[in-house]
From Swiss-Prot:
This is DNA mismatch repair protein MutS. Signal peptide: none annotated. GO terms for cellular component: cytosol. Keywords: ATP-binding, DNA damage, DNA repair, DNA-binding, Nucleotide-binding. InterPro entries: DNA_mismatch_repair_MutS, DNA_mismatch_repair_MutS-lik_N, DNA_mismatch_repair_MutS/MSH, DNA_mismatch_repair_MutS_C, DNA_mismatch_repair_MutS_clamp, DNA_mismatch_repair_MutS_core, DNA_mismatch_repair_MutS_N, DNA_mismatch_repair_MutS_sf. PANTHER family: DNA MISMATCH REPAIR PROTEIN MSH1, MITOCHONDRIAL, DNA MISMATCH REPAIR PROTEIN MUTS FAMILY MEMBER. GO terms for molecular function: ATP binding; ATP-dependent DNA damage sensor activity; damaged DNA binding; mismatched DNA binding. The keyword DNA-binding applies. SMART domains: MUTSac, MUTSd. The gene is mutS. Pfam families: MutS_I (PF01624), MutS_II (PF05188), MutS_III (PF05192), MutS_IV (PF05190), MutS_V (PF00488). GO terms for biological process: mismatch repair.
Length: 895
């Protein structure tokens, strides 16, 4: 939309808008942020506010809408949630003193990945901006949470010039809110599948020059004031460095100020953590319930009793990034064990942590210049708790609880306590949120401010005192101090005494009965009185900035303490959860044995109502019990058993105690899951396609130290196709690289139980069921051996299927079991008649089949069939044989 005739204000607006074309421009006008033209048309329906216009009487009036500046955050949040970006344009001078149009500038751009306001953020989740690129044969991923200062990067080998699946999974694992991609990716068919994988993330395309390696390195070195990136372990990093440089460029463009709170760039490797891809995270319900997408019903809902926001974020990271280092895991378990064994100290620490605010986000806001007086007060309260926290921690010995990452803990504690004292001496407890209203600085801190405050509070009495002093000094009984809007404050003396005024009095006005004068001293007093509020606000802001700068200088120490307290918080939370839920410390082994005695599903056991949770034992190893085929009816609990094994392994490697009587566990490097049945119809993917994609991912990437959880693969296609696929996958995982992989395979294909006799490391188990009077009771107990019954009709009855349907199902089942080819109808006479017809049809069919073979030499085929021992064949072997015979028949029929 264009404007035919531009006013000076609209010229300014359009000039600024031109620099930020992909944003909604919040243009400050007095007490409102206004939006014009296309921005107004986009924003009004999202914000649910009235759309109006400027110059309504003219042709083509300009669409506009506005929101109060005090409520801007609420409206900005709505725009961000709808996928829009917001450029905040402020008035840079007082409109009262401006000559011409008020000077305005964009002070920051808010995007989904660039949010500092805690009201717009999930307190216990990071808010990552990520960047992905390909450079010199490598694929790199970097991410930054500007609200906490976290900045990380990694890279891996590109596959045929493309981003590998492992890096796509990593971008999903960090749950980025915004992803930067090179502009050249947009519209390029090569990257269409990659972009499709990130449909839940807002993608921002930026110029390819932002990803250039050389400029990225220079940008990072300048940012961290270093000569090289060697100290960050990034000197040999190509794509990872390019991605990090692109993020830094984007941050500088949107925030328009330095990010001093981003103190380091951390390089990490994907293979140093237990990998759980995004699908497995969903299937295991680590962070969200798969049905409701809520936190309730997930693993984190059970484990998260952290006190602080930063502790909550770290716990989430521990769940998504379990360790594979035995030493690292044991260090966490040692800390949890000690905290669990000392409930008095643990409870005292947790009580003190209730007064600790989000130090990471407070530090970031202060460093970025977005903090208000109440943020400083929150920091003060938090820092005052350090001595009490350290006093309790000194009674414990676990290395994780001693803050060894802080070089001199006592010195840092003392420095930060002194910083808290400074805040206490300067910032009022009842200070307002706004920085321009005064009322921020404590009385007694600044003599100059105290004088201004005295004048502001008692201006009239101060003027009266000045008048009394002048009257006494001059001896003029008629002397008075008065005020009007023309002259301000002035001295008035009667006509008779006007000849006796001191020489330094300056005549200002002559009246019939009096003369009016001013003095330099009076004008100075007047200036102080009339400008007291403005001077007060200005001085208080300057003093506030000085205190803020003192805090910024201590930002590294604040962040170290924040990270340490977050770790303490997580340890205390895991200890509390372990005690409340009767968890036990897992033992770790190097023997590739996964042995769980009386294991429980941590979430399901909390949700069971009206019945006792039945624990189950599982043992997996690489010698005899590597692949377990688990059969049993629906609703019996197969899926729960499968998931609990994966969750117990994950919990142990994140450093948590586990829900089991005993757990002796090997280190798992990756967990794969194929569980659940959520169709992705919106992408045109059926249940079967989703299953096959997940299965393909597993068979292509599983290794010796992985754990594979398979639940009902092969559905959504014909029975024999599904069974064949399930069988082949089970065999493949058993034979993988000649070593196999630990696998739990729940299935309704009872034919798979034959694998136990064919493969040395396959074992059969089933979920026990008790039958009585044509009903079943689920015992929920995993027992050795297979089963050949699915109890589908009984489960249907439990689900509330009408009796008429159940009765009919039994008839059909009996008929099928007796004669699979028989067609069952409503009428028994029809059944007999149909059966007779079927026999006749089969006889005719056999004759036709004999005629088909007539005239051709099929002796070879008949000989193969005669010599084949069907009882020793697997379904895969049988299908292969049938395929070969069909090819031979076709070739002979064409002769």
């Amino acid at each position: 939309m264009t404007v035919k005739k531009e006013t000076p204000m609209m010229e300014q607006y359009l000039s600024i808008k031109k620099r930020y074309p992909d944003t909604i421009l919040f243009y400050r006008m007095g007490d409102f942020y206004e939006m014009f033209l296309d921005d107004a048309l986009k924003a009004a329906p999202v914000l649910e506010i009235a759309l109006t216009s400027r110059n309504k009487t003219q042709e083509d009036p300009i669409p506009m809408c506005g929101v109060p500046h005090r409520a801007a955050d609420v409206y900005i949040a709505k725009l961000i949630e709808s996928g829009l970006k917001v450029a905040v344009c402020e008035q840079m001078e007082d409109p009262r003193s401006a000559q011409g149009i008020v000077k305005r500038e964009v002070v920051r751009v808010i995007t989904p990945g660039m949010i500092l306001n805690e009201d717009l953020l999930d307190k216990k989740s990071n808010n990552f901006l990520a960047a992905l690129c390909i450079c010199q044969g490598a694929a790199g991923l970097a991410c930054m949470d500007i609200s906490t200062g976290m900045f990380r990067t990694t890279q891996t080998v590109a596959v045929n010039g493309k981003v590998p699946l492992s890096l796509v999974d990593e971008a999903l694992r960090i749950d980025a809110k915004e992803l930067l991609l090179p502009a050249s990716f947009k519209g390029d068919p090569t990257y269409s599948q990659l972009i499709k994988a990130f449909e839940t993330i807002q993608i921002s395309y930026v110029g390819n020059e932002n990803f250039k390696l050389d400029s990225a390195r220079e940008r990072l070195k300048e940012k961290f004031r270093t000569r090289s990136l060697e100290g960050f372990g990034c000197e040999d990093l190509t794509a990872g460095t390019a991605a990090a440089g692109a993020i830094l460029s984007y941050v500088q463009e949107t925030q328009l100020r330095e990010t001093d709170h981003v103190l380091t760039l951390e390089r990490y490797e994907l293979n140093t953590y237990l990998i759980i891809d995004d699908r497995s995270c969903r299937n295991l319900e680590l962070l969200k319930n798969i049905q409701t997408s809520d936190k309730k019903g997930s693993l984190i809902s059970v484990l998260d009793c952290t006190i602080t926001a930063m502790g909550g974020r770290l716990l989430k990271a521990w769940i998504r990034y379990p360790l594979i280092s035995m030493d690292g895991i044991e260090a966490r378990l040692d800390a949890v064990a000690e905290a669990k064994e000392n409930p008095g100290i643990r409870n005292s620490l947790r009580t003190h942590l209730k007064d600790v605010y989000d130090l990471e986000r407070l530090g970031s806001k202060i460093s970025m210049g977005h903090a208000n007086p109440r943020d400083l007060t929150a920091l003060k309260i938090s820092l005052y708790k350090l001595p009490l926290l350290f006093k309790d921690l000194n009674q414990l010995s676990a290395s994780l609880l001693q803050g060894h990452g802080i070089e001199d803990r006592e010195k840092v504690s003392t420095e930060l306590f002194e910083l808290a004292d400074l805040i206490n001496q300067t910032i009022r407890e009842d200070a307002p949120l706004a920085l321009n209203e005064g009322g921020i600085i404590c009385d007694g801190y600044s003599p100059e401010l105290d004088e201004i405050l005295e004048i502001a509070r008692n201006g009239r009495s101060w003027i009266a005192k000045t008048g009394a002093k002048e009257k006494e000094k001059t001896g003029l009984s008629s002397l008075k101090i008065k005020f009007n809007k023309v002259f301000g404050y002035f001295i008035e003396v009667s006509k008779i005494q006007s000849q006796q005024v001191p020489d330094h009095y300056i005549r200002k006005q002559t009246l019939v009965n009096a003369e009016r004068f001013i003095t330099d001293e009076l004008k100075e007093v007047e200036s102080k009185v009339l400008n007291a509020q403005e001077r007060r606000s200005s001085l208080e802001y300057a003093l506030f900035c000085k205190v803020r700068e003192s805090i910024v200088q201590r930002t590294p120490s604040i962040f170290k303490i924040a990270q340490f307290l977050a770790e303490v918080d997580v340890v205390l939370a895991l200890a509390t959860t372990a005690e409340e839920n009767n968890y036990t410390r897992p033992a770790l082994n190097k023997d590739q044995v996964l042995d769980i005695e009386d294991g429980r599903h941590p979430v399901v056991e909390k949700m069971v109502v009206g019945e006792r949770y039945i624990p189950n034992s599982i043992r997996l190893d690489n010698t005899s019990d590597q692949v377990q085929i688990i059969t049993g009816p629906n609703m019996a609990g197969k899926s729960t058993v499968l998931r609990q094994v994966a969750l117990i392994s994950l919990m142990a490697q994140m450093g948590s105690f586990v829900p089991a009587a005993r757990a002796d566990l090997c280190i798992i490097d990756r967990i794969f899951t194929r569980v659940g049945a959520l169709d992705n119809l919106s992408l045109g993917q059926s249940t079967f396609m989703v299953e096959m994609e997940e299965t393909a991912n597993i068979v292509n990437n599983a290794k010796e130290n992985s754990l594979v959880i398979l639940d009902e693969i092969g559905r959504g296609t014909s029975t024999f196709d599904g069974m064949s696929i399930a069988w082949a996958v089970a065999e493949y995982l058993h034979d993988l690289d000649g070593k196999g992989v630990k696998t739990l395979f729940a299935t309704h294909y009872h034919e798979l139980t034959r694998l136990e006799k064919l493969k040395p490391r396959v074992k059969n188990f089933n979920i026990a069921v008790k039958e009585f009077n044509d009903n079943i009771i689920f015992l929920r107990r995993l027992v050795p051996g297979g089963t050949n019954k699915s109890y589908g009709i009984q489960v249907a009855r439990l689900a509330g299927v009408p009796d008429a349907v159940i009765t009919k199902a039994k008839q059909i089942l009996a008929s099928i079991e007796q004669s699979p080819d028989q067609v069952v109808t409503q009428d028994k006479k029809q059944v007999k008649k149909q059966t007779k017809n079927n026999h006749s049809a089969r006889s005719g069919s056999r004759q036709q089949q004999m005629d088909l073979f007539a005239g051709h030499d099929y002796d070879e085929i008949i000989k193969v069939l005669d010599q084949t021992d069907i009882s020793t064949m697997t379904p895969i072997d049988a299908l292969n044989l049938i395929h070969e015979l069909k090819q031979k028949i076709r070739s002979k029929a064409m002769i």
